[in-house]
Amino acid sequence: MKRNILILGASYGSLLATKLAMAGHDVTMTCRSATSNLINDKGTDVRIKLRDEDSHRAFLSADLPGKIHATTPDKADPAAFDMIALAMQEPQYRAPEVAALMRRIAASGKPCLSIMNMPPLPFLARIPGVNASELRSAFSCPEVWDGFEPGLMSLCSPDPQAFRPPEEEANVLHVGLPTNFKAAEFADLAHTEMLQQLADDIEVVRVDGKEVPVKLRVHDSLFTPLAKWSMLLTGNYRCITAGEPQSIRDAVHGDAELSLNVYAWVDSLAQKLGAAPQDQVPFEKYARAASSLLKPSSAARAIAAGATNIERVDRLVQALAASQGMCHPEVDRIVDLVDHRLSTQVTQAA
């Protein structure tokens, strides 16, 4: 059955949109007016390297069986879609037109799949023993999540690494690390079955007889997407320094012993919350992948560019750990450094 999916965010969201359209589903992405006009005029261009090929292939939306359309948040009607995907950075949801759309989405009762690094508060509320109200300070605008039913919110770990090449237009996305999206199930079996059907449709797509990387995997554990936390605290947030940002590779391999220690500590937090060891990704596998990540993380690049607000998974993990009687000096250092960099830039912006 063909599905109609709404995705908030047309940058990273264009990767999921392309995978869904390759499988025959229709997708509408919300974005700024200029980007919306560009996508509707020229289409999307997502570049993925197939296995055993030397260069990336460009997958153009005009060539796909499903349709990709773009619109602005104020024009999106959630009731017209089967499922909503959230693919924006957490601070972006506080923009008035996006916050208004989020209220409409919550009222629609549609299942929502987050592919954010920052797990939404309604998803955190699904984890037994977690008091989501104690975590609101980690969010730039926690109010946008207040109307959502927790069981309608799932989380999909955004493991594939992709970026907009700076020399290209905003409709282009380059996939640097084509790993899989890993989603937790919904509370309602019918919603999980819909998600699994999307995953199955993506799985069978072939191009010239070859599989296309970046699959959607559905897991019965709420904790599988949380494996990303260890990666974020070990690599992404440690790209942030007092000066220029460093690459994820250097953040991880510059002090491999400390990286392993941080990674294992975040894993232990997830397990204390209820994760099973098999929900986690072994450090060795992550370290191998990190060795090819030669750019700073998006969080580090944003701070280097003068941002006054970024996603704060570091602060979220610190707060969750404190609720479990846990702390780690390197995590505390990261949080303090990010706080300092952001507050300095807030002052400078004023």
Model-derived regions: residue spans:
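NAD(P)+-binding Rossmann beta1-loop-alpha1 motif at the extreme N-terminus of oxidoreductases
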Residues: M1-R51, L121-P122, A350
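Anion (oxyanion) recognition and catalysis
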Residues: A21-M22, A106, Q271, A322
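Residue-level detector of anion-binding/catalytic polar loops
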Residues: D26, P111, A276
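Conserved N-terminal Rossmann-fold NAD(P) cofactor-binding segment
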Residues: T28-D82, M102
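Rossmann-fold NAD(P) dinucleotide-binding segment
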Residues: K75-P120
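Rossmann-fold dinucleotide-binding core
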Residues: A79, S114-S230, T234-G235
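Well-ordered, non-membrane alpha-helical segments in soluble/globular domains
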Residues: A95-L101, H191-D201, N261-Y263
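NAD(P)-dependent Rossmann-like dehydrogenase/reductase catalytic/cofactor-binding core
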Residues: P166-K182, D200-N236, G243-A350
